[in-house]
Amino acid sequence: GIVDAQDCPSGGLEENGWANPCGLEKARPTVDEWQNQFDQEILDAARQTRVPSQLMKLIFAQESQFWPGAAMDAKIQEFGLGRLTELGADTVLLWNYAFYSQFCPLVLAESTCEYGYSYLDDEDQAMLRGALTLSVNADCSTCPSGIDLSGIDFSIRLFAQTLLANCEQTGYLVN
């Protein structure tokens, strides 16, 4: 593990695998350092998009506890600090045209992308959603702690763009 809690009872863990009070105490400095390492990227994304940085940080804390690795079970796959799903990818591609117009030509032919996400066939939409969700997957079997942080800035910017897309969709529905 990342934290050495061998001098704690049961190595710092309860029977269910959760940290015991001693394990929590040992982990606190590492946890604080881990979650605060993303502050500059969050601030940069906030400045670029006008999405409040505190909102993003609180959502990251709730959704992923600042762990950008994949969370997968039989029903759903979530990636990145914001836990992007295929439905979340669909939302940002459909409701944030500025983001779509930058991302789509990285995956599909520019001529295929020119009319917008809703005009793509189902196969091309699925390819874009898959490429987008996997682009924020930080899992790496050969990296320290199993996480590759080299793409974290894109993951954070994408999350801000996804929040903008959700606002756009909500505004459409309310009006």
Regions found by a protein language model. Give the residues of each.
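Cell-wall glycan-active module
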Residues: 1-175
